[in-house]
Design a protein with these regions (language model features):
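Glycine-centered structural positions embedded in regular secondary structure
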Residues: 14, 93-96, 197, 203
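A short helix->loop->beta-strand "cap" motif at the edges of active sites that frequently abuts
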Residues: 134-137
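Conserved SGNH/GDSL esterase-like catalytic core that processes O-acyl groups on lipids
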Residues: 51-127, 145-152, 156
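Catalytic His-Asp segment of secreted/periplasmic serine-dependent ester chemistry enzymes
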Residues: 151, 155-205
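Hydrophobic/aromatic beta-strand patches that form the interior of the parallel beta-sheet core
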Residues: 59-61, 139, 169-171
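N-terminal secretory targeting modules
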Residues: 1-59, 103-106, 165
């Protein structure tokens, strides 16, 4: 439909502009511009996966959700170093990344699994991404909890950050988990490790 409209616009503007009211010309030009913008966004998204580097060494930074799955993650992704802690917030990860960089132990691929313990804003998330650097591939795991009140408040900035940073990708744990209650323990938040670890491996491979 977009292509058809664009062709009509080009024909009208190129061959019949003298016969068209100025308002109609402006509307057609606006539609043509919107079509071009949509196409550019689609092209940018399509080209994004090709910018991924090989996985290489992997660092995973998370909270208690990742902590519970740490042994399974390390077994499933042997080159992965897991740094996870209960009640960890996004802003705390900035200092962790700084420390790992100073020790020259931050992986080529960084998995972030934070946001379960409270919402955060895009600015804080961007500070973390900037600290990790554009030369690394980042995967941010969306949060999920059957009774997690701020799930959307955490996932909205995660999705926004992936859109505005070419090296940031989403691991949609929330999307995958909603149809699989059997993946979780009784609290509806903490998960059975094997499913989580396998999702991480599949997403970064």
């Amino acid at each position: 439909m977009l292509v058809a409209v664009a062709l009509v616009c080009i024909f009208c503007i190129g061959h019949g502009s003298a016969l068209m009211p100025s308002e109609t010309k402006e509307e057609l030009q606006q539609v043509q511009g919107e079509n071009q913008k949509q196409q550019e966004e689609q092209d940018a998204q399509a080209s994004k996966p090709s910018s991924r580097k090989s996985v290489g060494s992997v660092t995973a930074i998370g909270d208690s959700v990742m902590l519970g799955a740490a042994p399974a993650i390390q077994e499933t992704i042997p080159d992965c170093v897991v740094d996870a802690k209960e009640s960890r917030q996004v802003k705390e990860a900035i200092e962790i990344v700084k420390s790992l960089e100073q020790q020259d132990t931050l992986g080529d691929t960084v998995i972030i699994a934070l946001g379960t313990n409270g919402p955060f804003d895009v600015s804080t998330g961007q500070d973390l991404i900037d600290q990790i650097g554009k030369d690394r591939t980042i995967y941010w795991v969306t949060v999920y909890g059957e009774y997690l009140q701020w799930q959307d408040e955490s996932n909205d900035p995660i999705n926004a950050l992936a859109k505005q940073n070419y090296n940031v990708y989403i691991i949609d744990w929330a999307g995958a988990a909603v149809d699989h209650p059997e993946w979780f323990w009784k609290d509806g938040i903490h998960l059975r490790p094997e499913a989580y670890a396998q999702l991480l491996l599949t997403s970064i491979s």
